[in-house]
Amino acid sequence: MAARLCCQLDSSRDVLLLRPLRGQPSGPSVSGTSAGSPSSAASAFSSGHQADIPVGRLPACFYSSAGPCCLGFTCADLRTMDSTVNFVPWHAKRQLGMMQKDFWTAYIRDQLLTLWEEGIIDPRLKLFVLGGCRHKYM
């Protein structure tokens, strides 16, 4: 089960926002609320967000304080949205000669978010998060 979400960095709050592909420009952050149950998670959104976020299409673990069981970053150029690629190998190919990172967290913190904050990543590039797990949809 996977939910396709768009990433957006909110530098004013220093959080990474995850929003549905066709949602409004705001959404739940990765740090998120510490909602433990699906019912309290759904109520964490304002009524304006509930119309935009298909809560029934997201896995139950998406709203847990630990986040989804599995996250995979993909990207697509806005000109060719139908052909998405895995972000990690794509970015690694662009950064040939870059020292290899052993830890995914360090890679995201040191490479992706730094480049994003500095505006180096091409604005035509859209990043998506695929959260997949064995949990049931809410």
UniProtKB/Swiss-Prot annotation:
Major localization listed first in the record, in broad terms: host cell
Q: Which GO terms describe its biological process?
A: DNA-templated transcription; symbiont-mediated activation of host NF-kappaB cascade; symbiont-mediated arrest of host cell cycle during G2/M transition; viral genome replication
The protein's PTM annotation reads: A fraction may be phosphorylated in insect cells and HepG2 cells, a human hepatoblastoma cell line. Phosphorylated in vitro by host protein kinase C or mitogen-activated protein kinase. N-acetylated in insect cells.
Q: Where are the transmembrane segments?
A: none
Q: Where is the composition biased (Low complexity)?
A: 25-43
An example of a Pfam family matching this protein is X
Q: What is this protein called?
A: Protein X
What lineage does UniProt assign to this protein's organism?
Viruses, Riboviria, Pararnavirae, Artverviricota, Revtraviricetes
